[in-house]
Amino acid sequence: MSSKLPKKSEENLELPTFPASEESLSRSEKLKYVFVRNPFIPLGCLMTVGTFLASGYYIRRENHLMANKFMRYRVMSQGFTLAALAFSVLFIGPPRREAPSNSSGSINSEIKK
């Protein structure tokens, strides 16, 4: 039974963390890739941080009505972020890769017959 399980070194080689085209990207290029791929997730994160900071501002000013209002906005922006994340996982999915070409052509010839 243990002979069927792959070794840990083989597991790491089979599951890359990024697609091969993204390995050479810098941090700013990866951030740009995320914004282009699904702009609503970073937007939701920025909205959450902004409303949280505004709520803290109003707490320091002792305006508790506005602080509570911005805490409600924070919860709504977190919900927006989670909805955007769920949408991207369910409908957009991972980037598609090209299928590897078969040099022998035997599979293609069998399908044509």
UniProtKB/Swiss-Prot annotation:
Membrane topology: Multi-pass membrane protein
Record localization: Mitochondrion membrane
Keywords from the named record: Membrane, Mitochondrion, Transmembrane, Transmembrane helix
Entries under PANTHER family matching the protein: HIG1 DOMAIN FAMILY MEMBER 1A, HYPOXIA-INDUCBILE GENE 1 HIG1 -RELATED
Entry annotated with the keyword Transmembrane helix: yes
Organism annotation: Schizosaccharomyces pombe (strain 972 / ATCC 24843) (Fission yeast)
Lineage of the organism: Eukaryota, Fungi, Dikarya, Ascomycota, Taphrinomycotina
GO biological process: mitochondrial cytochrome c oxidase assembly; mitochondrial respirasome assembly
Gene Ontology cellular-component terms listed: mitochondrial inner membrane; mitochondrion
Listed InterPro entries: Hypoxia_induced_domain, RCF1
Superkingdom of origin: Eukaryota
Domain HIG1 per the UniProt entry, residue ranges: 12-103
Entry's transmembrane regions: 39-59, 75-95
Name of protein: HIG1 domain-containing protein C25B8.07c, mitochondrial
Region annotated Disordered, chain positions: 1-27
